[in-house]
Amino acid sequence: MNFQLLEKINLSLLKDDVPVECKQRIEIAIMELKELFTMNQKLQKEEKIIIGLSGGSGSGKSVMAESLSYLLNNAGLKTIIMTGDNVPFRFPRLNDEERLARFRNAGTASLVSHDLYNEEVREKLQKWMTDFTDASYDYVKENPWFSYYLDAGKKALEEYLGSPIEQDFYYCNEILSAFKKGKKQVWLKNLGREEDSLCYEEADFSEADILILEWTHSNSDYVKGVDIPIFLESTVEETLEYRLQRNRDTHIDSPFLMMVLGIEQNQLESQKNKALIKIRRF
C-alpha cells in the first residue's frame, strides 16, 4: 500500500451534515494514522491494511467508518467497509431472546441449587419477568434471595456476550484473511433482521488497499488480522440514547438492557488498551 497517499487526504471534503464533534474525532484519527505509518515500518510494508473500529452503539463507528472511507478513497487509497452487524450467529430478535433466556435460566437454577426456590419466590419472579423488571437490583433490599438470581444471571450473560457462542468469529476471520491474501471476489453474509432475510452478497476486493471492520467487537481477542485497532470512547448512557433514537429494540430502557449495556461497556474498557488509536469524546 502506498502510505504516502495519506498526505493527500483533504479534510475539507467532509460533508456538511457531519456533526462538529465527529469531524474533530475524524481529524484526530487521520492525524494518528499518518503518524503510525510514519513511525511503523511494518505497516509501511503491508500491501493491504485492516483497520478495526470498536466502541459501543452510538460511539460514532458508522460515521467514522464512512468518513474515513470517503477521505481515503478520494486520496487514492481504495477502501471498503465491513460491518459487524452480520457476524452474530442469530438474527437480532432471536439473539435478544437467547440473551434473556440464558439470564433467566441461570438465575432461576441458582435459586434452586441454593434451596431458595419456593412457591412465593416463583410467583414474584413470574410477575417481575412479565413486567420485564427481573434484572432490577431494586428488589434485593426486601428480597435478599434475589441477589443469587441476579448474580448467576449476570455471570451467564458475561460468558455469552461477545463470545464465540454469540459471534461467528471464524466467519469474520475468514473474510479478513481472504482480504489480506488478495482474494478478488468474496461472498459476504447479510444477516438481516428476520429469519427469512439471510443471504450472501458478492463483494469486490480486487483493488482494495484498506478494509475497515466497523464492529463493537473488532478489538476482541477472538478477531485475528486487524493491523490498526481504533477505539471510540462512549458511555452506557450514550449507547442507551442511541438505541432509543433507533427504536429497533423492545424494552429499550429496561433493567435487563441496562445490564447488557453495562457488561458490553466493561468488555470494551478491558480491551481498549490494545487499541493503537484511542479517541475520546469532546
Name every feature range the model reports, one short phrase each.
Residues 1-31:
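Charged, amphipathic alpha-helical linker segments immediately N-terminal to NTP-binding catalytic cores
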Residues 58:
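Walker A (P-loop) phosphate-binding loop of P-loop NTPases
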Residues 61:
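Conserved lysine of the Walker
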Residues 64, 68:
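Hydrophobic positions on the alpha1 helix immediately C-terminal to the Walker A/P-loop
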